[in-house]
A protein has these predicted regions:
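Bacterial N-terminal signal peptides that target proteins for export
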Residues: 1-9
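C-terminal motif of bacterial Sec signal peptides marking the signal peptidase cleavage site
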Residues: 17-20
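Bacterial signal peptide processing site
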Residues: 22-25
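N-proximal, solvent-exposed amphipathic alpha-helical segments enriched in charged/polar residues
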Residues: 32-180, 198, 202-204, 232-303
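Short, non-transmembrane amphipathic alpha-helical segments
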Residues: 191-217, 323-345
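Extended, H/D-rich, highly charged conserved domains that either
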Residues: 211-222, 235-237
């Protein structure tokens, strides 16, 4: 079932306009002009909610509205960073915008053109750039690096008597730990310390906040900021959020809080064993003994405040015959039930060169794993 409401385009346009930036203002004018052709948009919300961890989504005119800067946000250096960047911002947002009170909408305020200008270097041609101007130095320690990698917007809507309206915004700021560049045709890189990254991120967040608040419709809208530290290209764990803050009004953020997150890749290398790593090592050993031709068995464990919040196990196999996949999935299920943590959500993904072959999910209420084999 879906709830169906009608939302005036002019009202929506006033909400999503961004007078602080000429490009967004122009986009808003185009949206207003298009309302002459149609007086209303049909906005629907899904009534089914998979769990309290998920937001119900809004659908406009029967279609899911993608993020206005979607093309720009796909440019982080690894898929692991991109995944953590997007899902981590939702995790931060839940504490400010409860899932039982707010609906999720992909960002509709900051468009791709504006994002591209903001994440570029500041210059005479691009005064809105949030990265420092090129100082002409090409040495790793002397050049002005690209600090800001990406900006992600998520909108959180509330339901009123007759429609939906903007209830809050979350802005993710992805910052580089390593800036990759080319010098005389050769690959080079500049490492960025955590201290410098945080200093730059706070300044960038305040600038973005000021630009958003210049729009009357956004002066009193709560805006959550999350600072994400993007890891290097060879890190398969991916980055994490390191800072968060919420601005209720005004143009300065003064209430930054540290976010204690980390991603640990298993098996560990030269590190002290943990409860999760020991359980995984027992699981890995037994699975590989049963199927010695596996290409690899690894895991990623996400921690929040030093507590394991999720484990994702990846098993790569060289074979993909149906009988072999079934046998492997059955054995992995048995071993997972025997060794893997019972108090932490765990997923097991079995893949081959053709893609995912089987998927195991732990039923937390029963403490057992179930599996699905893909055709």
């Amino acid at each position: 079932m879906r709830k169906t409401l009608r939302l005036g385009l002019l009202g929506l346009a006033s909400v999503i306009s961004l007078a602080a930036c000429a490009d967004v203002t122009r986009a808003n004018q185009q949206s207003t002009n298009s309302s002459k052709d149609s007086n209303t948009k049909v906005v629907q919300s899904t009534t089914n909610q998979l769990s309290n961890n998920f937001y119900r989504a809004l659908v406009t005119n029967g279609k899911y509205e993608v993020n206005q800067n979607r093309g720009a946000t796909l440019s982080l250096n690894t898929g692991f960073n991109l995944k953590n960047f997007e899902t981590g911002l939702i995790d931060l947002s839940r504490s400010v915008f409860p899932t039982n009170q707010y609906f999720f909408r992909e960002g509709q305020i900051i468009d791709a053109e504006t994002t591209a200008k903001w994440i570029a270097r500041k210059s005479d041609k691009n005064p809105d750039g949030l990265n420092p101007a090129d100082n002409g130095d090409t040495s790793p320690t002397g050049r002005a690096p690209i600090y800001l990698a990406q900006i992600l917007e998520q909108d959180y809507m509330i339901q009123t008597e007759n429609n939906f309206e903007l209830g809050g915004i979350s802005i993710g700021i992805a910052m580089n730990s390593v800036d990759y560049y080319t010098n005389d045709g050769k690959d080079a890189e500049t490492e960025i310390s955590n201290e410098v990254m945080i200093e730059q991120a706070k300044a960038i967040a305040n600038t973005i906040l000021t630009r958003l608040r210049q729009n009357d419709a956004l002066k009193a809208v709560p805006i959550v900021f999350g600072v994400f530290r993007q890891t290097s290209k060879d890190d398969i764990g991916g980055g994490v959020y390191v800072l968060e803050a919420t601005s209720v009004e005004g143009t300065e953020i003064t209430n930054w809080s540290n976010v204690n997150q980390k991603v640990v890749v298993l098996p560990l290398v030269n590190e002290s064993a943990t409860e999760e790593s020991t359980a995984f090592e027992n699981f890995r050993t037994e699975v590989q003994n049963f199927f010695p031709n596996l290409s690899g068995v690894t895991a990623r464990v996400m921690y929040q405040d030093n507590v394991a919040k999720k484990m994702v196990v990846n098993i790569m196999t060289q074979f993909y015959g149906e009988s072999e996949i079934i046998a492997l999935a059955q054995h992995v299920t048995d071993v997972a039930n025997k060794y893997l943590p019972k108090t932490t959500p765990v997923e097991v993904r079995i893949s081959s060169i053709n893609g995912m072959e089987a998927f195991l999910l732990q039923d937390m209420s029963q403490g057992v794993f179930t599996y699905h084999i893909f055709d």
